[in-house]
Amino acid sequence: FPVDEEFQSPFGSRSRGYFLFRPRN
């Protein structure tokens, strides 16, 4: 999935927890 883009976001570490809630985002 496009997880790379999520990690590159300004959220950084927060992206990990957020990814669990919105894995399709």
From Swiss-Prot:
The modification Asparagine amide is found at N25. Its main location: secreted. GO terms for cellular component: extracellular region. It is found in: Secreted. Keywords: Amidation, Hormone, Secreted. One of its GO terms (biological process) is regulation of smooth muscle contraction. GO terms for molecular function: hormone activity. Pfam families: NMU (PF02070). InterPro entries: Neuromedin-U_amidation-site, NMU_C. PROSITE patterns: NMU (PS00967). It comes from the Eukaryota. Stimulates uterine smooth muscle contraction and causes selective vasoconstriction. Belongs to the NmU family. This is Neuromedin-U-25.
